[in-house]
From Swiss-Prot:
Quaternary context: Component of the NDC80 complex, which consists of NDC80/HEC1, CDCA1, SPBC24 and SPBC25. The NDC80 complex is formed by two subcomplexes composed of NDC80/HEC1-CDCA1 and SPBC24-SPBC25. Each subcomplex is formed by parallel interactions through the coiled-coil domains of individual subunits. Formation of a tetrameric complex is mediated by interactions between the C-terminal regions of both subunits of the NDC80/HEC1-CDCA1 subcomplex and the N-terminal regions of both subunits of the SPBC24-SPBC25 complex.
Protein name, per record: Kinetochore protein Spc24
Species name: Mus musculus (Mouse)
Major site of localization recorded for this protein: nucleus
Function: Acts as a component of the essential kinetochore-associated NDC80 complex, which is required for chromosome segregation and spindle checkpoint activity. Required for kinetochore integrity and the organization of stable microtubule binding sites in the outer plate of the kinetochore. The NDC80 complex synergistically enhances the affinity of the SKA1 complex for microtubules and may allow the NDC80 complex to track depolymerizing microtubules.
The keyword Cell division belongs to this UniProt entry's keyword annotation: yes
Length: 201
């Protein structure tokens, strides 16, 4: 603003000199000074305008950067929310997977226990067969030697069929267990056994 004050003072001085009708040389000198001051003023205005434009450009860049930063922040918040949702979903899936895994482990343990029980039962059966089957075979063979009965194992269910080889003739056996009592059937079969004692030669 000092330049404007200088310009006013020079103008007043110039007017006073013109009014006093001074020498032309002094007037030219003063006019030259006035022109120089005007040029300086114009240069200062140009510099101020240029600086203002630069300041406005910087402010615009800062505003644009601020808008971009806000947009990045908004996108970051959106991505963060999506990640939180995905994390919650993954946590739920992980919980379900862990529950299913625990269930499978329990089922596997039960299967192992069942397998061990089956193996134990199989060993027990093998041990029983080692003792029982030969004994049962011996009893069956002994009963066959005593009763002389040849059984028909392919007859209908509920029917008792076979052939009793007696001392003189072979007699067929045909009994219906649905109509006859077990006691009657047992007594009848034992009645076929020959009670005559014949010592071996």
């Amino acid at each position: 603003m000092a330049a404007f004050r200088d310009m006013v003072e020079v103008s007043n001085w110039l007017l006073s000199l013109l009014g006093a009708n001074r020498a032309e040389a002094q007037q030219r000198r003063l006019l030259g000074s006035y022109e120089q001051m005007m040029e300086r003023l114009l240069e200062m205005q140009d510099g101020a305008y240029r600086q203002l434009r630069e300041t406005l450009a910087v402010e615009e860049e800062v505003a644009q950067s601020l808008l971009e930063l806000k947009e990045c922040t908004r996108q970051g918040d959106t991505e963060l929310q999506q990640l939180e949702v995905e994390l919650q979903r993954t946590s739920k899936e992980d919980t379900c997977v862990q529950a299913r895994l625990r269930q499978l482990i329990t089922e596997l343990q039960e299967l192992r226990e069942m397998e061990e029980e089956l193996q134990r039962q199989e060993r027990d059966v093998d041990e029983d067969n080692t003792v029982t089957i030969p004994s049962a075979v011996y009893v069956a063979h002994l009963y066959h030697q005593i009763s002389k009965i040849q059984w028909d194992y392919e007859c209908e269910p509920g029917m008792i069929k076979g052939i009793h080889h007696g001392p003189t003739v072979a007699q067929p056996i045909h009994l219906d267990s649905a109509q006859l009592s077990p006691k009657f059937i047992s007594d009848y079969l034992w009645s076929l056994v020959d009670t005559t004692w014949e010592p071996e030669p």
